[in-house]
């Protein structure tokens, strides 16, 4: 009997510590969902960062949105062909893309920055405090009751 890791299937949710627990579920686009390449980093106990290789894109070409617990990052290069230019080899990909990441509860996007061709999206986990247990006195017995 061979062991099978589910970790690669759950690569696109952010918020837990281990890969099997780290990811709630994956959102897969088309077969080309590995473009552009990206990293998911953990910084301390409560901070995460998604770094997306966005070489050749400007801030105006990128869109970052969070809706219903899904972080969506899309990019589309505007046509900017110079007249008289013929590409002998065009190896720099400038195609449109869309990546989606399901955020688990209590993960918030704190900001995004494009620097040196890398789009960094900062995430933080904000876990609400647990309510303190309440004690009540029974009118008949005069002793505390736990709720």
From Swiss-Prot:
CDD domains, alphabetized: ACD_IbpA-B_like
Calcium keyword on record: no
Keywords: Stress response
Gene3D superfamilies associated with the record: 2.60.40.790
Entry-linked Pfam families: HSP20 (PF00011)
Residues annotated as transmembrane: none
Keyword Plastid tagged: no
Ranges of residues in domain sHSP: 29-141
UniProt record similarity statement: Belongs to the small heat shock protein (HSP20) family.
Protein name: 16 kDa heat shock protein B
Source species: Azotobacter vinelandii
């Amino acid at each position: 009997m061979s062991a099978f890791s589910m970790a690669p299937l759950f690569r696109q949710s952010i918020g837990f510590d281990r890969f099997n627990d780290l990811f709630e579920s994956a959102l897969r686009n088309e077969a080309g969902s590995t473009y552009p390449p990206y990293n998911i980093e953990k910084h301390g106990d409560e901070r995460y960062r998604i770094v997306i290789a966005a070489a050749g894109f400007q801030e105006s070409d990128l869109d970052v949105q969070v809706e219903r617990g899904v972080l969506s990052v899309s990019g589309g290069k505007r046509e900017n062909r110079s007249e008289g230019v013929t590409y002998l080899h065009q190896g720099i990909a400038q195609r449109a893309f869309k990546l989606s990441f399901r955020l688990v509860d209590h993960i918030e996007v704190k900001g995004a920055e494009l620097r040196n061709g890398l789009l960094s999206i900062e995430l933080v986990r904000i876990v609400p405090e647990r309510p303190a247990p309440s004690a009540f006195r029974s009118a008949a017995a005069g002793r505390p009751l736990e709720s």
